[in-house]
Amino acid sequence: AAMREAMAAADVGDDVYRDDPTVLALERRTADLLGKDDAVYMPTGTMTNQVAIRTHTEPGDQILIDANAHVARAEAGGPAALSGVMTKGLPGIHGVFTAEDVHAAAMPVHPFTPATLLPPTKLLCIENTHNGGGGTIWPLDAVEAVCAAGRQHGLRLHMDGARLWHASVATGVSEREYAAPFDTVSVCFSKGLGAPVGSALAGSSELVARARRFKAMFGGGFRQAGVVAAGALHALEHHRAGLAADHSKATAFAGGLSRITGIGIDLARVQTNIVRFTLAAMPSGAFVERCHDAGLHLLTTGADGVRAVPHADISEAQIQKALAIVGAVVSEQAA
């Protein structure tokens, strides 16, 4: 209710002309939290990531990224279509790769291969937390190590921090500390924070000015954007601390799943608010459909994989109800 009231009362203007006071306030607050000069508000996290790639690269370049990262697998082929770049997948473990992986990928394929035959490697991206890895947190020392390796090869650095708020709450490492090594950082105001619309891209004044051009090119211009920016600003100021409760609900749900015969889960991988598990004897599609019919909404992650994401609107009682639904569906299949 408080977020809706803030949105209804928002001062608005025209973001295209940069005279929307609420958007400007959101951009200033985001830049300050991340320790950057400036930030630009956009409709989606996919747009902030793709604008960042276009800002840092030219067609024919190559970017280094975990092979299962959102940018590489779930942004509609944007790097190729919008920036004309290649993605070189790094062999991360649940999304986390090493400095050695960066060195190996950034080196020429063969010392005698002419440089003119190779795509210039320009950008290194990480995703923190890592969605495909199950909400995996990058430790700060691992972030600093891979960024240092990237700098050794002259690479620019971008962090897809759509869920950075989760990493910060879980570890106690501030968003500013996590963002410090990077040229640009994207953050999302809906992932856990509960705003209806929007992400922001933060960086130096020069990079953000360049990014604003590509925001316009990619169709990201708003008019009375303050209405949705007010929701994002409210979420930023009031909802970050509540993420710890979401993590506790995920831990409780995962623990309950581990006691259900026919469910496979690695509890060590449940680090934030994403719970991934496998089914021993039932296709995930049929399982998710049965759960949906019973009032539990889940996603498939492959033939036998399932993903659940507790959030602020889910109560502890609903976690127990969800476990009961899962147990009933699995038992029915076994019978």
Segments (PLM) and residue ranges:
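Conserved PLP-enzyme active-site core in the AAT-like
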Residues: 1-10, 14-281, 285-294, 298-314, ...
